[in-house]
Amino acid sequence: MASAVFEGTSLVNMFVRGCWVNGIRRLVVSRRGDEEEFFEIRTEWSDRSVLYLHRSLADLGRLWQRLRDAFPEDRPELVRAPLRQGLIAIKDAHDIETRLNEVEKLLKAIISMPRKYSRSEVVLTFFERSPLDQVLKNDNVHKIQCGFQSPVKISEIMRSNGFCLANTETIVIDHSIPNGKDQHGAVDPAEHLFEGGGELPAELEDGDDPAAYVTNLSYYHLVPFETDILD
């Protein structure tokens, strides 16, 4: 299963000031044609730098697990935190726009947690650029100039040109992901929501390009000034 790979953090004395979910990319992550959905996240840091990240539902689930492992004495408090409920809400969302909004709500809750957690190595590493982010950064992405019929929080709307990760012959695989077989004691049902790749229900209709980019706006929100860009 593809995943963003996190190996420590170089973001010393920095923290995430804000984050927004721009959309979803459905990427081919194996030569067998297996696909996985990645949320594109725009992050603004304390030094005013901006990073675009791509994280899957499984990555979000592992972040929660790593927080619990990093702060074992605070596990009861973390279980009551919005993170667990947010993960379940994302898993249960059957509408794409609702799912994107739930992901954004969850990420904002994470960076709003007490500094002990929000500025911990676990959280900063999650928001650090991964090898997958670097690969996708070089992808040709069309920036669409938009007008809005109703207030929208997203500041930048983008659409992919059908990028396929397998075409680059670069597949990022995290072999260190625990399979859960060695866990003992009481098991939280939420921990198993993200096993097996954290698959989400397919929202694309028949005939749609499976690699198409889905923005955090409905068709009625998006009114491009140059419609030929979308042809």
Curated annotation (Swiss-Prot):
InterPro entries: PX_dom_sf, PXDC1. Residues 1-134 form the PX domain. One of its GO terms (molecular function) is phosphatidylinositol binding. This is PX domain-containing protein 1. It comes from Bos taurus (Bovine). The gene is PXDC1.
